[in-house]
Amino acid sequence: MARVKRGVQANRRHKKILKRAKGYYGARSRVYRVAVQAVTKAGQYAYRDRRNKKRTFRRLWIARINAGARLNGLSYSRFINGMKKANIAIDRRVLADIAMHDAATFTALVEKAKAELA
């Protein structure tokens, strides 16, 4: 049986990891052993933060909608309640965008929500 030498595979594996670690500080981008740990940890952070990003953006949208609603004399929760009662189904991302860039349209939405609450 022929002897199996794994130099080629090891070299490929090392290159793949070091390529992913490019731009890391110090030994993290140069030493394979350290780079493996850095790349693994980076993957864990990326996985976690892809989920956290959704929460973060939702919080941002709510803050923006709340600010716009309060400028028109309504709290966020009452505004959302009024929108649901008026059967206006616009998601928070779009509402936040309208609140930021189109004040007149947002004011009209707030007025419709107020009318439903009254």
Curated annotation (Swiss-Prot):
Listed GO MF terms: rRNA binding; structural constituent of ribosome
Cross-referenced Pfam families: Ribosomal_L20
InterPro entries in the record: Ribosomal_bL20, RIBOSOMAL_L20_CS, Ribosomal_protein_bL20_C
CDD domains per the UniProt record, alphabetical: Ribosomal_L20
Any one GO cellular component localisation term in the record: ribosome
A Gene Ontology biological process term: translation
Domain of life: Bacteria
Keyword Cytoplasm: no
Membrane-traversing stretches: none
Annotated keywords: Ribonucleoprotein, Ribosomal protein, RNA-binding, rRNA-binding
Matching HAMAP family: Ribosomal_bL20
Similarity remark: Belongs to the bacterial ribosomal protein bL20 family.
Function: Binds directly to 23S ribosomal RNA and is necessary for the in vitro assembly process of the 50S ribosomal subunit. It is not involved in the protein synthesizing functions of that subunit.
Entry protein name: Large ribosomal subunit protein bL20
Organism placement in taxonomy: Bacteria, Pseudomonadati, Pseudomonadota, Gammaproteobacteria, Moraxellales
